Amino acid sequence: MLANLNDVYKLANEKNIAIGAFNIVNFENILAVLETAVKLDMPVILAFAQTPEENEVMKLDTIGPVMVLMAQRDKVTVAEHMDHGVNLEYIEQSLDVGFTTVMFEGSAISYGE
């Protein structure tokens, strides 16, 4: 079940558990994380960063919709997270795909900007 981060944190608080966040770089990662989450009946965060795309490993427009679709069909609570998005266009693209949470990486930007 696709959820936002507030829903995931609420479950973590109710069950007194930590939630794993896993950076996804291929389809096998998605399967491994979600199959294990279902087996353990644990909520999970699937994350994707810009780095795999910059390194030409995987593109957001290829893997993002698959991540969202698989989260929607699963029995466990899953948040889709854009991890370390370095520009607003890329973050907007992740939200358009269906991601439910983002983290803007501004460490390379000067304080003046």
Predicted regions: what they are:
Residues 40-42, 96-102:
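Glycine-enriched alpha-helix->loop->beta-strand junction motifs that scaffold or abut catalytic
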Residues 1-20, 64:
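N-terminal amphipathic alpha-helix/helix-capping segment at the start of soluble metabolic enzymes
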Residues 31, 56-64, 84-93, 106-113:
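Active-site-adjacent beta->alpha loops and helix N-cap segments on the catalytic face
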Residues 57-80:
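Alpha-helix-loop-beta-strand connector modules within alpha/beta enzyme cores
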Residues 8, 33, 67:
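Aromatic/hydrophobic pocket-lining residues that form π-stacking "cages" and hydrophobic walls in ligand
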Residues 26-48, 53-56:
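N-terminal low-complexity or amphipathic/hydrophobic leaders
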Residues 19-23, 44-48, 78-84, 102-104:
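Hydrophobic faces of well-ordered beta-strands that scaffold small-molecule active sites
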